Amino acid sequence: EPEIFYIGIGNFAERTGMLPLIYDWRAPVSGLFYDYDKGPGSYEAPAGLIEGEIAAKWQYKVKNGKMVYAFESDTKIDDDILKQELGTNSDVQLKNIVRTIQKEQNAIIRNTHDRILAIQGAAGSGKTSVALHRIAYLLYHDREHLKSSNVLILSPNSVFSDYISHILPELGEENIQEMSFDLFAYRELKGIVPDCEDRYDQLERTMKLQDPYLTERFEEKQLEGFVGMMEGFLARLEDELMDFRAIEYKGIQKTEEELINLFYFKFQNAPLLSRMDAIRDYCVDEYETLLGRDLSEEELLIVQEKFDKMYVTKDIYKIYGWLLEECGYPSLPDVEYEKRKLEYEDVFPVLYLKYRLTGKAVHNHIKHLVIDEMQDYSYLQYVILNQIFKCRMTILGDKAQTLDEQMRDVLQFLPGIFDQKIRKIVMNKSYRNTMEIARYEDAVLDEILSKAKLGEDEYETAAIITMTEAEASTLYQILKARGEEVHYINRNSSIFKKGLTVTTFYLAKGLEFDQVFGV
């Protein structure tokens, strides 16, 4: 008599400690459903390898207490079920794919061996869903060491964060932290500058001015060559930034020569702007040992001031200005802190300098990082991410959907940054569209547009996509004046709603709509 296993969103048992009546889709035995057809099968259980024969596979869907479908499936996920699930209208939130996980997707979700997974996925291949289900799987299997608070997803914007926010709770896990890398950078730069231009401002400015030099300058500052220029500058800065002088305060006495030896030899590996702090602590410890007591806070402040005066400046904003001048770029305005604002092209170079000069980078509480839209991150940004997060990563995107005009393939340079510790996976199968469908749509596009009605009742979501924010705002106002029920997504939006939406191409990244009209 074959043993029957039921698989669902989560475990269900009559009482705690009893065998489940329904097994969680992430349980080891559940992998049989996704990985095998009828016939021989095996799975790795805590007790070892379990082998057997799959006699039959059935699929059920129950909604509101009623059976939607029930039939035997000879394949992993029956095509009729897949078509039914994919054929439903786009919801205002991403759907979980537990019922339709494919074998190649399941291999990614259950991968626990590779430290860094880089997934190149075509539009509609399900890469974002797969990444989120992978996080749910890892949280389930490593509960002792991995909590939701240890996971961070870097997403394109707040609307996208809202779009995916329900997936993990729906799969039985607490939500994880989500933010854009830009927002992360702005928070890290507080104390250096109070304000930064964002990526959207930079895009709008570039499109408005149509100045190729601005685009070229922005791109240059994000490339490997500029990282090399910054490293060369930092090597020379050791000599240019320091003004050594003898220290004498109470029993603390160090000659200029002694301080130079400590700086260049004993503490040579300490970050430049933290090095004198290390030397100060060394001298204070030495003196306190001889004195037999600790210095008071007031005395320590006096000593600190004497050591700090050996820096020409500790202001990273000014130091970056020197770098720009040395590299032949326009320098930063020489203004007081409150009036400083970085252009977007300078945000990540300054962040890189901060980490290299202070050493305050690693966020050890993050044990798994998810990077979505990987194609929109620069070489410099990945170098910084490698400095900050010494953890497992799931990196995903599609090089065909990049905002970068040069269409650089990030998978070419990622292994060099992460020391080859990367498993590359390609997901070519799209569940949204095909070349044949796209060609047919192009052929009948005029006829479709002449008959189409914006936001027809049978569609849950529709979008009008513009190039610039000004165009989107104007169009939104026109439609509102006509009495249309319409939503507007701008950079400050945080919720994705049903109905007709007007937005820009760069804010629509990652979202799905039933109807899309480009203006």
Please tell me what each predicted stretch does.
Residues 1-84:
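N-terminal accessory nucleic-acid engagement/regulatory domains that precede
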Residues 99-111:
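Pre-Walker A adenine-sensing motif
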Residues 113-117:
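Pre-Walker A (Motif I) flank of P-loop NTPase domains
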Residues 119-121:
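Hydrophobic anchor at the beta1->P-loop junction of P-loop NTPases
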Residues 124:
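Walker A (P-loop) phosphate-binding loop of P-loop NTPases
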Residues 127-128:
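Conserved lysine of the Walker
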Residues 139-369, 375-384, 392:
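Alpha-helical nucleic-acid-binding subdomain
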Residues 144-145, 149, 158-174, 179-186, ...:
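Conserved helicase motor core of SF1/SF2 NTP-dependent helicases
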